[in-house]
Amino acid sequence: MKMKKLTLAIAAIALCAAAAAQTTPEEFQTRYDRLVRNLGYDGVGVETLLDRWEEAFPDDAAVPKARFNYYFTKSQRSEVLPKPGQRRFLGNAPTLTLKDSDGGDVNYFEEYFYDEELFGEAMKVLDAQIAAHPDELRWHYLKITALSAFEKESPDMAAAELRQLIAHDASAHPAWTLDGESAGTEIFQQGVGEYCASFFGIGTDAGYEYFREISELMTKRFPRNPVFIDNIGSYWLVAKDNEKQAVKFYKKALKIDPQDEAATRNLKIIERRQAQAKAKKK
């Protein structure tokens, strides 16, 4: 095992030395991809390669993305910890289940922790890119994703960042891009929708409230998009166990799109639950 690590480290040094002779961004990218495959985003030699890449091609957007990945990955450590009474943690199934002294099941989950200084360096990279390229969605998405991972059960900063993004869209009507390509309003809505789903998947009170709040903002911004109306219905159904309110929003979504699968499926679930409840009373 030690010999394998030594071999990989020597290979990393060789790759970085070769990088000094690279003449195109594509060649740097190839060297970087090979290094990451072997050693990971924060492996030996990655930072040196990025320094040389940035020096040779300071405007290559691949460099800050790679540098963010370097700091973000380096800031992480994980532990498998017991979470008594929890079936899921941050939307994830248990890594393993063991018995306690009374014979009961105790679920263990992998949980990530972050070095604040290194995480801060990752955020500096993204903030600089957002300031320089405010209409490039990738930088915003990376920041929201990282903040949500850092905050875990209560994604306060991630939600605030998402609110700012929606406000910017409403006030400035920017010509969004995603990875340098033109991104229309549908792509923007899809991206926000994915973060709503992420907040919902956290499964905490804070996650549900941000799921509702962002969905309501997007419903005001895009009233003809049934996805966010469905979201509000799901908030009432799952977080508040209020079927009457949920039905109201699902039916509203179906008026906009009669083929809305989410609304149709959830209304059937509610109907089945109500029928079962009536049957029990008989």
Describe each model-derived feature in a short phrase.
Residues 20-109:
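N-terminal leader/linker segments that initiate helical-solenoid repeat arrays
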Residues 58-61, 131-135, 170-171, 222-224, ...:
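Short coil turns that delineate tetratricopeptide repeat
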Residues 63, 139, 174-175, 191, ...:
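TPR alpha-solenoid repeat register
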Residues 69, 145-147, 197, 234-235, ...:
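Residue-level recognition of tetratricopeptide repeat
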Residues 70-128, 132, 149-189, 193-195, ...:
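Short coil/linker segments at helix-helix boundaries
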Residues 178-238:
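Alpha-helical adaptor scaffolds
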